[in-house]
């Protein structure tokens, strides 16, 4: 931790206010990922050991990064998706949140727990409870596992499918991905 604390900021090394370092940012890695999206009939042709879950719903959001913050679109999409399905944070067994930067996920959690912020940005008047940090990225997120540019969504989704398929029946997961600064796709999965 002491060595991480001594790393110089990558984007603002002069002012002393920069916070993004090689220690708290996801590495852009080489990689590829693929997922199958199929009907029940299509799944019947795959081996029984193949992890499988149901895509219940998804929500996309776009924000103005100059007024609402860089990489904050998931905070608009997540509350909308949960509210449409009458769910609270604790109804979700697994949260796979893309962490381009560690601080970005910390900002997401703080904003999601702020009722006023959720009302203003997502247009949702609902209290979701305390965010269950122990259910988020339990096997590591993008900072730990890498950020294969162009394949991050499939990497995170396939990780969520594998983890969710091993959980008790009817468990739910949220997969949240931010992109291009002001975009987000959030999916609700169930096994």
What are these regions (language model features)?
Residues 36-40, 83, 188-191:
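Short beta-strand-to-turn element immediately C-terminal to the catalytic PLP-Schiff-base lysine
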Residues 56, 64-144:
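Active-site pocket-lining segment
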Residues 17-33, 58-84, 97-99, 145-155, ...:
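Active-site pocket-shaping loop/turn-to-helix segments
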Residues 84, 127-189:
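Internal helix-turn-beta structural module
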Residues 42-52, 88-89, 163-173:
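Phosphate-handling active-site elements
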Residues 48-58, 62, 171-183:
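Short, conserved aromatic-histidine micro-motifs
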Residues 1-45, 113-118, 122-135:
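N-terminal extracellular/periplasmic Venus flytrap/periplasmic-binding protein-like
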